[in-house]
């Protein structure tokens, strides 16, 4: 046992981290001599928005590697819609039944974060968005949070646990400013000692009026000023931003940007994106609503089945150049210009290919350009 309340990799990989009814199901099926060949599909019947971003495939493949199954899936970073299968598994049911809990956990959580990040990134209209929310979740999953946010399109992350290849971004906390006699001393110290490649973004709302501190920071050499209390201000945040921008411009600092953070939502970004140069987003990404995926049998011993409320039979998803999707039963010929989205990733337990985080992110960014 570790010192923290976390589940280790071995418990997940062995299938020990599961719901108890899967243990009982497997035991009783074994006693009855039943282990049918089935095909299951993972779909979401309800989404937080009109579309979702599929994420978490990397962990899902690592979980299923070595099991006697075939796994098909949409590429990570694919846009998907309600009722579309994102993963399909074929094999003897008892060989993978106990892995359902972890499998769904991997993709439900990661896809929820990636989806929220993609929506926020689309709302930002080309302005940088940084993930500041790993502190809003258990530290054991901070790497997953930052990876999922990156796949969703953010431009950097604050957590030092972010996977390699994700730029780290962060300015300074209020505590840093408060350790000095006055904000100016803090900003000058930061400028003296921070690495040269770290932008001189100065936090400007610790003690005084934002526009006063912003102007002082600009005079001290700030490349941008960061405002971090939009949700706690009793005044009109729009007015505050306009005043800061006005004072910077009229005093000869038009190139000093405004960085906004602090409880931001997608609606906030839509409201402020015309005047703000970059955003730091915490809980709206890290605490995103999970995608409510479910795993359902659609075929048993090559015969189509479904439970009530689900569509029976194996399905394929096709995508057109304009981004539209088409769902068809397997075996039905699609239109010539429709491209199949579901690919094979595991054959007889062997991984054929794994997601590339950078390609997954590029797939999202190319898809969301005109979505908001």
How should each PLM-predicted stretch be described?
Residues 1-94:
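Flexible, solvent-exposed loop/hinge segments and secondary-structure transition points
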Residues 48, 78-80, 87-253, 266-267, ...:
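Buried, small/hydrophobic-residue-enriched core segments of structured protein domains
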Residues 40, 69, 87, 130, ...:
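A broad, low-specificity signal marking well-ordered, structured residues that form hydrophobic/aromatic
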């Amino acid at each position: 046992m570790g010192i923290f309340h976390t589940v280790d990799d071995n418990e997940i990989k062995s299938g020990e981290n599961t719901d108890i009814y899967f243990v009982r199901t497997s035991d009783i099926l074994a006693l009855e001599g039943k282990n049918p060949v089935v095909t299951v599909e993972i779909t979401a019947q309800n989404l937080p928005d009109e579309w979702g971003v599929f994420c978490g495939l990397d962990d899902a493949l690592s979980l299923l590697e070595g099991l006697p199954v075939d796994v098909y899936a949409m590429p990570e970073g694919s846009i998907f819609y309600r009722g579309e299968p994102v993963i399909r598994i074929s094999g003897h049911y008892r060989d993978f039944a106990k892995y359902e809990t972890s499998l769904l956990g991997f993709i439900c959580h990661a896809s929820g974060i990636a989806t929220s990040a993609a929506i926020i990134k689309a709302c930002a209209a080309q302005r940088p968005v940084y993930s500041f929310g790993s502190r809003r979740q258990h530290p054991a999953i901070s790497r997953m949070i930052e990876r999922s946010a990156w796949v969703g399109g953010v431009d950097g992350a604050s957590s030092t646990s972010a996977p390699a290849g994700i730029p780290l971004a962060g300015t300074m906390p209020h505590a840093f400013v408060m350790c000095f006699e006055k904000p100016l001393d803090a900003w000058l110290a930061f400028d003296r000692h921070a690495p040269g490649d770290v932008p001189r973004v100065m936090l400007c709302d610790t003690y005084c009026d934002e526009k006063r501190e912003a102007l002082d920071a600009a005079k001290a050499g700030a490349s941008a000023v960061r405002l971090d209390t939009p949700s706690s201000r009793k005044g009109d945040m729009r007015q505050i931003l306009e005043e800061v921008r006005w004072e910077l411009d009229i005093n000869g600092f038009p190139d000093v940007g405004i960085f906004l953070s602090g409880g931001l939502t997608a609606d906030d970004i839509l409201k402020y994106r015309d005047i703000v140069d970059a955003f730091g987003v915490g809980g709206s990404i890290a605490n995103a609503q999970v995608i409510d995926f479910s795993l359902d049998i659609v075929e048993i011993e090559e015969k189509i089945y479904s439970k009530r409320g689900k569509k029976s039979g194996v399905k394929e998803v096709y995508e057109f150049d304009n981004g539209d999707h088409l769902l068809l039963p397997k075996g039905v010929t699609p239109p010539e210009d429709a491209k199949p989205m579901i690919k094979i990733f595991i054959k007889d337990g062997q991984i054929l290919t794994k997601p590339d985080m950078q390609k997954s992110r590029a797939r999202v960014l190319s898809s969301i350009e005109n979505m908001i």
